[in-house]
Curated annotation (Swiss-Prot):
HAMAP family: YidC_type1. Pfam families: 60KD_IMP, YidC_periplas. Its main location: membrane. One of its GO terms (biological process) is protein insertion into membrane. Interacts with the Sec translocase complex via SecD. Specifically interacts with transmembrane segments of nascent integral membrane proteins during membrane integration. Required for the insertion and/or proper folding and/or complex formation of integral membrane proteins into the membrane. Involved in integration of membrane proteins that insert both dependently and independently of the Sec translocase complex, as well as at least some lipoproteins. Aids folding of multispanning membrane proteins. It comes from Porphyromonas gingivalis (strain ATCC BAA-308 / W83). It comes from the Bacteria. Belongs to the OXA1/ALB3/YidC family. Type 1 subfamily. This is Membrane protein insertase YidC. The gene is yidC. The keyword tRNA processing does not apply. Keywords: Cell inner membrane, Cell membrane, Chaperone, Membrane, Protein transport, Transmembrane, Transmembrane helix, Transport. PANTHER family: CYTOCHROME C OXIDASE ASSEMBLY PROTEIN COX18, MITOCHONDRIAL, OXA1.
Length: 627
């Protein structure tokens, strides 16, 4: 080859290279051509499938190829994932055992290893057919495909983790990665994808999610357990709220973003936490048949941020476990206030001051006592003594006031004898003279109510605490097998109208003892504080009526709560009796007589009362003049 030939070939090569370089397509054109090719192939596949399906219908045959075409017509690129064999994948640690299914790639069963049902059976939060988790996939060709209908392949499997893979083809897939935390009730779930540009729309930024669960009955009293069963949810960076636990059916549509949603019963919960947020939330619950094996049917649907085309991931955390207050609070340690999960609000402790008492006084005290005592009967006794000791200084003032009223009773009876009439004028004079006596002696007629008023917030706080604390669940004391439920010493199966509905088909002994002790408390305190006024006679039956109502109301409640109220009443009576020995009534009477000779400044309350009496007397006289 001569020199000129070589030069010519080089020049030709340079010309060809230069022409190719100058006329090369830009990256956008290449991507557009690739998408066009994919779309053309997809449309061609659809056309072929429809043609085969039409031919099969015409010929009356259904060969495998026609079934595949029909599957493609419904599921598109995911048609291949509709065929497969369902397989169970087990994950476990020391606290829970989970079963996941390759069909849908979701959790099918949750067993809590440390807990039993009321009748001693293994405690499952749900089993096969009782829970459903679904990601409706909206594809680029406007199909809506449910992951519950598709088969996933388990990869990277260990005893505590697995990746469920939904394959589109060899290079395109959707992954659900599960990791069970060691010695914990939490399960991490990550949703991610690879090369899914051909599956999802170009403008996709949110993914749909559906979750449902039939909440199983775990405790002895269906009615009482159902009262604490509901859907709870937390607004992103805000407070925790819930659906009504008393309505037969309830539902809400929430546009505000949510951080988590929970299906909870009295002592256990299933919680789904989104690391980002849920939007377009729809929550619904419906109460199951009374006395059945289920409490409520709960469902949620929402959307969450996800763009799998760009390789982003959506992270979630499932919590399947007991509602132990201190454990749930510990999940927020080290977090910023706005990032707190506030899962401790799943334990209902009341509102305002009652929650404050439980959170900062009762729970720390009971936690401390559990370090030294294992018997909850003893712990409740010590809690009761502690509360009584805490309010004893102020309660003493109440007992002192009751003693004053008791010592002044003969003088009040003299006033009643002086103005015996039942007409309005006599009643006004009698009331005015009695108030003047109390004011002169330095006694307050309402001060005797102070002990009850002081312990009232604690009584309400305990009413919120005992039925919801899992610490007393299946803890026995004396004849009570479970302090979190009623202690039936006698029961029957026949349905007695009204009685069975409002009282139940059993007799709770601690409830009965509570009622008896409350009657003793009422009789003793009313006898000590009775002033002899007619108004007292009119009101003396009210506490007894209330006690009978409580007998019906608490018969199906936690026996631990009734035991606390029983102790509280007995200790209060003992305090009253002890005050008779502590307070020197002779010295107190001398002090009252001395007070009568001293000039006393009227209290604002007494001044207003006397002013009201004067106005009432003036109106009465005007009415008499008109007559």
């Amino acid at each position: 080859m001569d020199k000129n030939t070589v030069i010519g070939l080089v020049l030709i090569g340079l010309v060809i290279f230069g022409f190719s370089w100058l006329n090369r397509p830009d990256p956008q054109e290449i991507e557009a051509q690739r998408k066009a090719a994919i779309e053309a192939a997809r449309q061609d596949s659809i056309a072929k499938a429809e043609a085969e399906l039409l031919a099969a219908r015409t010929q009356g045959a259904t060969p495998d190829s026609i079934k595949q075409a029909a599957g493609y017509n419904q599921y598109g690129l995911l048609a291949a994932a509709t065929a497969g064999a369902e397989e169970q994948v087990e994950l476990a640690n020391g606290k829970i055992a989970l079963k996941l299914s390759t069909k849908g790639g979701a959790i099918r069963e949750v067993l809590l290893r440390d807990y039993k049902t009321h009748d001693g059976k293994p405690l499952y939060l749900f089993r096969e057919g009782e829970s459903d988790f679904n990601l409706p996939l909206r594809t680029v060709d406007n199909r809506l495909v449910d992951t519950r209908d598709l088969y996933f392949s388990p990869i990277s499997r260990t005893d505590s983790s697995v990746v469920m893979r939904l394959a589109v083809d060899s290079a395109s897939y959707l992954d659900l990665a599960y990791v069970l935390l060691p010695d914990d009730y939490r399960l991490r779930m990550t949703v991610s994808g690879q090369n899914l540009q051909s599956l999802f729309p170009a403008n996709m930024t949110m993914q749909d999610l559906e979750w449902s669960q039939r909440i199983r009955r775990q405790e002895k009293s269906w009615k009482f357990e159902n009262q604490y069963t509901s859907i709870y949810y937390k607004y992103s960076g805000d407070e925790v709220d819930r659906l009504s636990d008393s309505k037969q059916e309830d539902k809400k549509t929430l546009e505000e973003p949510l951080h988590w949603v929970s299906f909870k019963d009295k002592y256990f919960a299933s919680v789904l936490v989104c690391d980002s947020y849920f939007e377009n939330n729809k929550l619904a619950q419906k109460t199951a048949a009374a006395g059945s094996d289920y409490l409520k049917n709960c469902t949620m649907s929402a959307t969450f941020p996800l763009d799998v085309r760009s390789g982003t991931k959506a992270r979630f955390t499932f919590f399947f476990g007991p509602l132990k207050y201190n454990m749930l609070r510990a999940y927020d340690k080290g977090m910023k206030a706005e990032d707190n999960l506030d899962l401790d609000h799943l334990v209902y402790l009341g509102a305002s001051i009652f929650r404050w008492i439980n959170r900062y006084m009762i729970i720390p005290a009971s936690t401390f006592l559990q370090q030294y005592f294992s018997n909850w009967g003893l712990i409740i006794l010590l809690l009761t003594l502690g509360i009584k000791l805490l309010i004893s200084p102020l309660a003493y003032k109440g007992y002192l006031s009751s003693a004053k009223m008791r010592l002044l009773r003969p003088q009040v009876q003299e006033i009643n004898a002086k103005y015996p009439g039942k007409d309005q004028e006599s009643m006004m004079k009698r009331q005015s003279a009695t108030m003047n006596l109390y004011r002169a002696a330095g006694a307050g007629p309402m001060s005797g109510c102070l002990p009850m008023l002081l312990q009232f917030p604690f009584l309400i706080a305990m009413y919120m605490y005992f039925p919801t604390t899992i610490d007393i669940r299946q803890q026995s004391f004396l004849w009570a097998e479970d302090l979190s439920s009623y202690d039936a010493v006698f029961s029957w199966t026949a349905d007695i109208p009204l009685l069975s509905q409002f009282y139940g088909n059993h007799v709770s002994l601690f409830c009965l003892l509570m009622s008896i002790s409350n009657i003793l408390y009422i009789r003793y305190t009313m006898n000590q504080s009775d002033t002899g006024q007619e108004g007292m006679a009119m009101l003396k039956w009210m506490p007894y009526i209330t006690t009978v109502m409580f007998l019906f109301f608490f018969n199906q409640n936690a026996s631990g709560l009734c035991y606390y109220y029983f102790l509280s009443s007995i200790i209060t009576v003992i305090q009253y009796m002890s005050s008779r020995f502590i307070i020197n009534e002779e010295k107190l009477m001398a002090k009252l007589e001395a007070n009568k000779t001293k000039p006393r400044k009227k209290s604002k309350w007494m001044a207003r009362l006397e002013e009201a009496q004067r106005q009432q007397e003036a109106m009465r006289r005007q009415q008499q003049k008109r007559k």
